[in-house]
């Protein structure tokens, strides 16, 4: 099952500071490289733990359909500068402050996942928060993508255990 960016929790209460707490699945963690996500990536737990602190401070972004800023359309990718993806058509709607690794039960069984914990700035994007609440209330899974890149020390190249391959590649060193 494709797990990326599945909303696990959105707090019920509007906070006076305008920040609505969220917990979102960032990606599934696999036992080995015989299983992978839709992009062919097999995230293993040890490498996920080794790199998970990069979630802290990671922006939560959205590209919107129109100026109402209610319905997300994509992630706003417009190109690349060297090995850095550029997202000029998206805005930062929140931020992740922490992470956790959790076992999450879904209709097809248990899944081990890396989750991001943070907030959406409801004071700036109230229609977007309402859209999320409505989708969750209707039982609709919200999906998105997580962009990861290589580290500065590796000139922006992601280092894969066993090298790059189409399916079952294991990211080892990344941001």
Predicted regions: what is each one?
Residues 1-175:
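Signature of dsDNA virion morphogenesis modules
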């Amino acid at each position: 099952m494709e797990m990326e960016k599945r909303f696990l929790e959105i707090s019920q209460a509007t906070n006076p500071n305008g920040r609505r707490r969220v917990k979102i699945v960032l990606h599934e963690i696999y036992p080995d490289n015989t299983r992978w996500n839709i992009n062919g990536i097999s995230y293993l737990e040890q490498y996920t733990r080794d790199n998970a602190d990069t979630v802290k401070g990671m922006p939560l972004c959205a590209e919107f359909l129109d100026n109402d800023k209610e319905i997300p359309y994509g992630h706003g990718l417009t190109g690349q500068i060297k090995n850095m993806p550029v997202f000029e058509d998206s805005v930062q709607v929140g931020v992740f402050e922490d992470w956790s690794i959790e076992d999450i039960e879904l209709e097809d069984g248990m899944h081990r996942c890396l989750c991001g914990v943070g907030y959406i700035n409801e004071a700036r994007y109230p229609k977007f928060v309402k859209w999320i609440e409505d989708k969750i209330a209707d039982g609709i899974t919200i999906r998105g993508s997580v962009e990861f890149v290589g580290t500065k020390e590796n000139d922006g190249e992601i280092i894969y255990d066993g090298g790059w391959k189409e399916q079952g590649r294991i990211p080892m060193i990344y941001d």
